[in-house]
Amino acid sequence: MLLPLPYIQETLGDEATILFQSFSWSFAASCVLLVLWRGLIAPVVAANRSADDLVFLTNSVVSLFPALTAPFLAVQALWELPISDHATALAAAPTPLALRAVGLSCGYMAYDTVFCLAHKQVRHPLLLGHHLLSILFFPYATLRHRALLVV
């Protein structure tokens, strides 16, 4: 059941709302890219590839989306943070761009976790652990105003 936006804002606050929306859009965009790749592009481009190659190629194509968007948001957000004030740099409140960058990254990691669980070729405990810990701790640290520069 999808929760209405006013309920999310009232319950979680504006920062969590921005992060949750970015997470949701990123997860959905990754799924749409997967469907487009599998349905339209892969049959033409990768028709003569092995099943293993197709899994890795599919994963690589979908991962281009966050790889080409999240760093630009994160770098732009970095310029808005008070990094010159060493006393408050690691406890700074996240900017909307930082919230979007974290949400975008975590949304993709949630998608990639599902993809890894569905395909044994990319199912590795370290990769799954990296994704799950990031999905848990990146939003937590960001919303608690802790170590945003590290996230």
In which residue ranges do the predicted regions lie?
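Membrane-helix and juxtamembrane interface regions of eukaryotic multi-pass membrane proteins
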Residues: 1-151
